[in-house]
């Protein structure tokens, strides 16, 4: 089932391309890519999911208005592929980090695809193009175009032809092009933009998204994969380096990117990976907005990453005594994971002949 409504005359082409994407993912960055996911039996073709729409309405109604004279940062996280927990992990951590360290509480929306976010009591709206479009539109109505800024963080698989892969469950799949993303941002009337894309080949989004009011940070060059997706990792290489490590050391997204690029280069060299070559594009008008935001910000303490490395995580079938540690919480609820004392780097995923779409 396609989630993406504004197909226009290219609907058939999108469907055919989607089949190619799915095949590529199944042969791509990790052995679990494209694994079967739960089927939402109640959701028919092109039907609106009332549970998801209620979750979206609740999230958007909770958004706080902008404050005159203050450069407010609105934050949107998008975990696109439900088959990999790393995308959910990073997106929920994005909320924790920006609410606690960067004083963005009331101005953060997370859209998440994961099997644990399906059902009658989701903890976040689903990560679909329509939900992203509506979220950006709602933020555009609340923010001051000349004063405030948006940070959009997307973490998912990317394709060689420069699309972002979206999978809610086995019947709901889509992909988002650079033009789709630009249209959603432009239609929302959002001025100052910080766009962070953690996906393979994400540098291919830069030409369509570039503007004087935009900072773009990508995990890879247009012709390169990035690494760390899969169910053997708790974070992608880029998510670990930029979001988890560098943004806890700096309040400057661009300075954090420079730190992350250095760390990723060293890690890829050490592990023998093809360099992903993260990219950035800085518009001439976005830098003063970032400077104003940072000047009015008193950054809080570093926020620990709450998802333990998988090599030390409890076995799925292992029984645990809940009274052994009264402060521990079930890993089944990603919003209530016990924060480890010192989060470590994710384990390198199993090598594959040609990683194509992490």
Sequence positions of predicted segments:
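Extracytoplasmic/secreted proteins, especially bacterial periplasmic and envelope-associated proteins
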Residues: 58, 89-93, 97, 127, ...
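Bacterial N-terminal signal peptides
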Residues: 16-28
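Solvent-exposed loop/turn segments at secondary-structure junctions
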Residues: 81-84, 113-118, 156-162, 170, ...
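A short, glycine/acidic-enriched catalytic loop
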Residues: 156-187
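Loop/turn elements at helix/coil->beta-strand transitions in domains of secreted/extracellular proteins
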Residues: 71-74, 104-108, 145-150, 188-193, ...
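Active-site-proximal C-terminal subdomain of hydrolase catalytic domains
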Residues: 199-284
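Boundary/activation segment at the start of structured domains
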Residues: 12-15, 29-148, 233, 292-323, ...
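Bacterial N-terminal signal peptides that target proteins for export
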Residues: 3-17
């Amino acid at each position: 089932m396609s989630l993406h409504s504004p197909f226009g005359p290219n609907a058939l082409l999108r469907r055919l391309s989607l089949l190619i994407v799915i095949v590529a993912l199944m042969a791509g960055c990790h052995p679990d890519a494209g694994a079967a996911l739960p089927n939402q039996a109640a959701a028919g073709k092109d039907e609106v999911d009332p549970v998801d729409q209620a979750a979206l309405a609740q999230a958007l109604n909770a958004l706080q208005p902008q404050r005159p004279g203050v450069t407010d940062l609105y934050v949107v996280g998008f975990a696109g592929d439900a088959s990999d927990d790393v995308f959910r992990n990073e997106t929920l951590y994005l909320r924790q980090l920006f609410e606690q360290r960067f004083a963005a509480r009331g101005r953060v929306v997370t859209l998440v695809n994961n099997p644990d976010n399906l059902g009658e009591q989701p903890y976040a709206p689903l990560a679909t193009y329509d939900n992203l479009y509506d979220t950006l539109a709602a933020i555009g109505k609340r923010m001051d175009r000349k004063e405030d800024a948006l940070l959009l963080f997307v973490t998912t698989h990317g394709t060689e032809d420069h699309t972002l892969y979206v999978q809610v469950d086995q019947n709901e799949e889509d992909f988002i092009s650079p033009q789709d993303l630009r249209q959603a941002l432009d239609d929302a009337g959002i001025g100052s933009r910080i766009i962070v894309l953690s996906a393979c080949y994400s540098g291919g989004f830069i030409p369509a998204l570039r503007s004087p009011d935009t900072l773009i940070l990508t995990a890879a060059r247009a012709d390169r994969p990035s690494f760390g997706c899969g169910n053997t990792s708790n974070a992608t290489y880029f998510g670990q380096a930029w979001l988890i490590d560098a943004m806890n050391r700096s309040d400057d997204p661009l300075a954090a990117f420079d730190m992350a690029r250095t760390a990723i280069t060293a890690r890829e060299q050490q592990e023998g990976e093809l360099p992903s070559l993260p990219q950035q594009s800085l518009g001439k008008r976005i830098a003063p907005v970032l400077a104003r935001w940072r000047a009015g910000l008193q950054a809080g303490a570093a926020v620990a990453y709450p998802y333990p490395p998988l090599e030390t995580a409890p076995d799925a079938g292992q029984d645990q005594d809940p009274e052994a540690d009264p402060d521990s919480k079930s890993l089944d609820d990603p919003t209530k994971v016990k924060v480890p004392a010192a989060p470590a780097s994710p384990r390198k995923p199993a090598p594959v002949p040609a990683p194509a779409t992490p």
